[in-house]
A protein has these predicted regions:
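Carboxylate-rich, polar loop motifs that coordinate divalent cations or form catalytic acidic clusters
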Residues: 1-181
């Protein structure tokens, strides 16, 4: 196996003998917009997911040594991600501070990805901030938000809402959820 390290100057792979540095430089094909990497995660398909200092997320293919920005440029380009959550069923959630989240699913045959945006104005979610994501024993995904719970089931694309305040008034109470077990 290898070890991966995030640094302020790209990511580093250590194979037990040597280090290899991956960072954007003029003339190379690495497309990261910032070399400072604040977070690294690995998914079940052995892709490295990284979040850079400018709150962008990339998927790094260790086989081809290529970086892919997620979501792709143009798709929700302005979203700033603060965390990456990899669920046991290989679904990946990219969470932002106040713009919702992006759900990423990898096709196990060709490793292509599909993304769904769960922003504050879409998919039935009225949450401003998603605090946590997890999947239960039935592979239902739960989003704990500052305005209720959202549940995504295997048979529905739209989430089911619990304890969500749909009123637009600022002084209306909301039920925030922070943790689970």
């Amino acid at each position: 196996g290898v070890l991966w390290f995030s640094t302020w100057d790209g990511i580093n792979r250590f194979n037990g003998y040597d280090f290899k540095v991956y960072k954007a430089r003029q003339g190379n094909k690495i497309t990261m917009t910032n070399n400072r990497v604040d977070l690294l995660e690995v998914d079940p398909y052995n892709y490295i997911w990284l979040q850079t200092y400018d709150y962008r997320v990339y998927r790094f293919d260790q086989r081809t040594e290529k970086f892919e920005q997620i979501p792709a440029e143009g798709e929700e380009e302005g979203m700033r991600f603060s965390s990456i959550k990899i669920l046991p069923d290989s679904v990946i959630w990219l969470l932002s501070e106040n713009e919702g989240a992006v759900r990423v699913k990898t096709n196990p045959k060709d490793y292509s990805i599909t993304t769904q945006v769960y922003a504050t104005h879409s998919r039935g979610g009225n949450a401003v901030h998603i605090n946590q994501v997890f999947s239960d024993a039935y592979n239902q995904e739960w989003l704990l938000t500052d305005n209720g719970l959202l549940k995504i089931t295997n048979d529905k694309e739209e989430p089911v809402s619990y304890f969500v305040n749909i009123q637009s008034g600022k002084d209306e109470p909301v039920q925030a959820f922070y943790s689970f077990c």
